[in-house]
Amino acid sequence: ADQPLTITFKAAKSSDLYGYKGDVYLHIGIVNEEAWLFVPAEWNENIDKCKMTSEGNNCWSISLSPSIREWFASGETPVNELGIVIRNEDGTKKGTDTDFYIKVTDNKYQMFQPAPIKEKAMPAGTREGINVNADYSVTFAFYDKDKNGKHKDFAHIVGDFNDWTPANDETSQMYRDNANGCWWITLTGLDSDKEYRFQYYTGMRDGEIIRIADAYSEKILDPDNDKYIPESVYPSSERVYPEGGRGIVSAFKINQEPYSWRNEFSLKDKDNLIIYELLLRDFTETSDISGALGKLDYLKSLGVNAIELMPVQEFDGNDSWGYNPCFYFALDKAYGTKNMYKRFIDECHARGLAVIFDVVYNHATGSMPFAKLYWNRTDNKTAENNPWFNVDAPHPYSVFHDFNHESELVRSFVKRNLEFLLDEYHIDGFRFDLTKGLTQRECTEATVADYDAGRIRILKEYYDVVASVKPEAVVILEHFCCDEEEKELAGYGMKLWRDANNAYCQSGMGWKEYSDFSCLYTGTNSMKYGGYVGFMESHDVERVAYKALTYGNGAIAKNLSVRMSQLAVNAAFCFTVPGPKMIWQFGELGYDVTRGTEDNKMEKKPLHWEYYTEPERKGLYDVYARLLNLRVTHKDLFQNDAIFSWNVTENYWSTTPRSLTLKNGAEVMYVVGNFGDKETGPLLLPDGIKYDYMTGRELEGTVSVPAHGLLLATSFQP
């Protein structure tokens, strides 16, 4: 560390810098507990100090002199390792795909030297995470046995209670309980009303040292992202980052602020759910829970009976769909405080609205403590010996880092998280993201949907936990696998997403090709009644109204009134089909902003609440509301014993329009949809049909349905 160092880089033919003629810069820092310290320049900052000298022949060099320590001006900080990236002027080209590291000997300043391991069994009843004991002491425990049964050489806790400094004493050094694979420590004398922040300091004596937050934390603090959260969403006084922390830290308080639940709620009919899929970020101007609270009466008036929140467990950054989770027991501060989430759920229950959490157990980001514990920093992915994660996903659809659900460690974690969310937040069920990926079978796009007994076993195990805590809770899977597998899961009690977007986009645009709706009904392939959660739109597919506006046939694209009428016909042939249904937010107003491409689909979308004041769009909303109200006021038509039939293939369109009939006892409903641009001929009404449900007028004999028009006729008065 007190000698000069010359770094020479020669670009291989495979390097982005091979043949490069511009300036090349060194991005470098002293690596200490994962952090890069004393970095001379930001990534996009070019300074002479870091400019490398071209030696010709694809070779560059730079000298750190008069010594490494002096070049960095690092003072008394130990210098044991350097992290290095070679880049061009704007950082778009790198010398190597991965960062590389140089070990350095420092004979002057030493890192903290952990004492030998102290072995001791954990107190009875201790679980991984933060355990508040009856005497107000707190026991901390984390598991670290790798896939080969080995563990870290040491573990200490650092935090507000010991000035963030590891020490070989009872305030910091953790005991080893090898039988349970855990490090643990009990701290006493803590202030029960004070919030404490902490991390685990762990590693190998001759290798990497890391600091991690607790994977079971119910609150974390993020130095890179919390500062951008508005004061109105999460008070800055409750997210003060500690001076001694590095990276994400855990936070806890013995006496947490209680929430007094005011409303008892139980989900009564899982087979008749009308779910509103909602992304808090894009739902109101404030992009938070408070904003959504102000719209609950709007949703109640619409007629939905459940809200499915897109992922709200802590995710990387603040601006996201949420499918990049990192901490599963903490809800993301970008939307509000813990008690604000509870209030939102409580207020939903007060209005008879169930709350479903969209949860992501297929993968996690590299910020997740389990990923960080055993990490391959050269390849920037989880290491071979990581007991929770696969190095690479065995299936073709994964992102970030793929959980191995055949691992008992993973399944125990997921089950505990499901129990926690149900108990702590009183939610009414889950939508599991990408359950097709919960497999260890090596597969391709062509084979991933094949019957997989292992995947089924895992999902049944998770379902059993949910049912044991709250039997009435719903479990919905984004699965998209073969019928045999989906039927087995539905038979066990779960529900499967049923994507009919393409067909309803086609009909919404006025094109009959590929517009067959048959897949939406469980009776089409003998699926268990209520087994499908059918939808025209979800967060992940294109908006029907956008396609109608952009690619609509004739007047559909050119005339707003015609377009909204066509979408109303669409809605009638979705929401009158028995079984659970889902609406993507603002579909009821004909939201016609594109989802975007695969590259930009997750970007924030513009709000158009003014649509509600436009007569044509308000008309569509009113049709939705009437259809959904029908499901409430005449529930018998939507039960398993009702007689259902429909004609919705490409053979039925305009001259011979599409139709749907539901009958249970004396109640009959008859729906006719004219998706074409010409009025139908006279249509003979079925026996018993007397009223136009949408207008209240009496009917008899025959009726004609106008172009882009809808008839919903019933045997009973509206």
Where on the chain are the PLM-derived regions?
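Tight coil/turn sites that cap or link beta-strands
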Residues: 193, 706-710
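Active-site-proximal helices and loops of the catalytic beta/alpha 8
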Residues: 313, 321-324, 351, 434-535, ...
